[in-house]
Each structure stands twice: as structure tokens, then as C-alpha cells.
Design a protein with these regions (language model features):
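Hydrophobic alpha-helical transmembrane segments
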Residues: 8, 54, 108-113, 150-154, ...
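Juxtamembrane helix-loop-helix connectors linking adjacent transmembrane helices
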Residues: 87-160, 178, 253-254
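Alpha-helical transmembrane segments in multi-pass membrane proteins
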Residues: 19-90
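Alpha-helical transmembrane segments
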Residues: 2-18, 36, 51-61, 113-120, ...
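Functionally important transmembrane alpha-helices
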Residues: 184-197, 201-254
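Membrane-interface helix/loop boundary segments of multi-pass membrane proteins
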Residues: 103, 162-189, 224-228
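Hydrophobic, membrane-facing alpha-helical anchors
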Residues: 3-15, 21-43, 158-167
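Membrane-interface starts of transmembrane alpha-helices
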Residues: 2, 69-77, 148, 152, ...
Length: 254
């Protein structure tokens, strides 16, 4: 087995564990955290470009063990901690290629508009056809009425788009680029992980995973074409605000 393949397998395990492999058993959780820490230490010594991404997914794993993780958006915690380290540790900052806004030309605005419109139509169609059970979401949304909920929706759209783009089209993309190299493979891999991460989101279930995967592919293309995250963040933000408004209508809160 070549060193690159070995590092690719290790990094993939690191990512999947960091995002998905949590248990109600605290012993299992802490043993997993120790294993992830070993992987991070190994990358620090043998493949430094993977050190930063691996470190973030260790932080993500630990954040999921926090008592408030069930509230959602808890990934703000590991992302904020990671950004502080990136800003103050020069070698880590030098390898963080995702911290760029990029350039947005006329063609990108056009494609971004098309992607946004198609995404909104897909969301509305999914909600109308499948009529999902959204009781778990309803229980965490406070109050009712446009005056109360609009600021919450805008804040959610801004924060969630920033966090998810930084993770999937930023940190994860950088790591996958090191171990996979080919743009198409990197894009498909990050979109697949993005899709699986949304299995309990909106849209949800198998169809939700597929829709999120397709959406992730297009956001990845935009990220590559603009060489930065600003355009994907804007597109994602509009989609998230649309999701919030659809949810409010479906939950009869507006």
C-alpha cells in the first residue's frame, strides 16, 4: 500500500468519525477521540497539509459530545477554535488554502442564480410531495409570527451557510485535495459527505441525501470556479433562508 493511499484512508476515517461515529457509550466516545488524536499527531509529523483538516474533525467529534450539541449549529464551536489556531499558528495558516473569498464574475452570478432557483423549486417540490414529519424541528423553533421568526431565519441562514461552507467546501476540500488530487473526485467526495450529513436535515431521508449531494456538487463547482467561498456562501444562504420560510409555513408558525 502506498503512503498516499494509507494517508487517504486515515483521513477518511478521521472525517467520518468526526462527523458521524458518536455513541451513547462514553467509553467508546473517548476511545474514539484518543484514536483521532493519534491520527492528528501522526499527520503533524508525516503529512502536515493534512494536520489542519484532521485537527478540525477531532474538534468536531469532541464538540458533538457537548451537552448542547442537540441544539444544532454546534459546529460553530470547533470551527471557531480551529480558526483561532489558524490565525495564530503561521504554518497552519499557510496550509489553509480555503480562507479566500474568491472572484465573482457575471457568469458566476448567472450560474448562482440558476442554482438558487432550481434549489428552491426542488425544496418546495420535495416538501409538497413527501409531507415530512417535522415534529423534531418544530419543538426547537420558538414563538410564531413573521416579526419574531424573520430575524431568527436570517441569523440561521447566515451562520449555517458560513459554517457549512467553511467545513465542506473549505476544510474538508483542502484535506481531500491532498489525498485525492483530482478535482472531479474531490468534488464528488465532499458532496457525498455533505449529503450524508444532511440525512436528518431538510430535505431529509434518502431523497434528502441525494438532493444535498447534487447541491454539494454544484456548490463545489462554484467554489472551484471562483477560487473562494464567498459565492457558495451567498448561494447557500439564500437556500437556507428559503428552507426556513418553507418550514415556518409547513409548521403553521406564519
Amino acid at each position: 500500500m502506498s503512503k498516499r493511499i494509507f494517508h487517504g484512508i486515515l483521513f477518511l476515517i478521521n472525517v467520518l468519525a468526526g462527523l458521524f461515529l458518536h455513541s451513547s457509550n462514553p467509553v467508546y466516545n473517548w476511545l474514539t477521540a484518543i484514536c483521532l488524536a493519534v491520527v492528528v499527531t501522526y499527520f503533524c509529523k508525516s503529512n502536515f497539509p493534512l494536520f489542519g483538516p484532521a485537527l478540525f474533525f477531532l474538534f468536531a467529534y469532541l464538540a458533538a459530545l457537548l451537552p448542547f450539541a442537540y441544539l444544532g449549529l454546534f459546529m460553530i464551536v470547533p470551527l471557531a477554535l480551529y480558526l483561532v489556531l489558524v490565525l495564530f499558528i503561521r504554518p497552519l495558516k499557510a496550509k489553509s488554502h480555503w480562507l479566500k473569498t474568491g472572484r465573482i464574475g457575471t457568469a458566476i452570478w448567472l450560474w448562482g442564480t440558476i442554482i438558487t432557483i432550481v434549489s428552491i423549486l426542488a425544496l418546495v417540490t420535495w416538501a409538497a410531495l413527501f409531507k415530512p414529519n417535522l415534529g423534531d424541528i418544530k419543538s426547537i423553533i420558538p414563538g410564531r409570527g413573521l416579526g419574531t421568526l424573520l430575524p431568527i431565519g436570517v441569523a440561521f441562514a447566515v451562520v449555517n451557510s458560513l459554517v457549512e461552507e467553511a467545513i465542506y467546501r473549505g476544510i474538508l476540500w483542502d484535506g481531500l485535495n491532498v489525498v485525492l488530487g483530482r478535482l472531479a473526485v474531490v468534488n464528488l467526495a465532499q458532496a457525498a459527505i455533505f449529503g450524508v450529513a444532511h440525512i436528518q436535515g431538510f430535505p431529509r431521508g434518502a431523497v434528502g441525501v441525494i438532493l444535498a449531494f447534487i447541491y454539494g456538487v454544484f456548490l463545489g463547482i462554484i467554489r472551484h470556479r471562483t477560487r473562494g467561498l464567498l459565492a457558495p456562501i451567498i448561494i447557500h444562504m439564500v437556500a437556507d433562508l428559503t428552507i426556513f420560510m418553507i418550514l415556518m409555513v409547513m409548521l403553521e408558525k406564519l
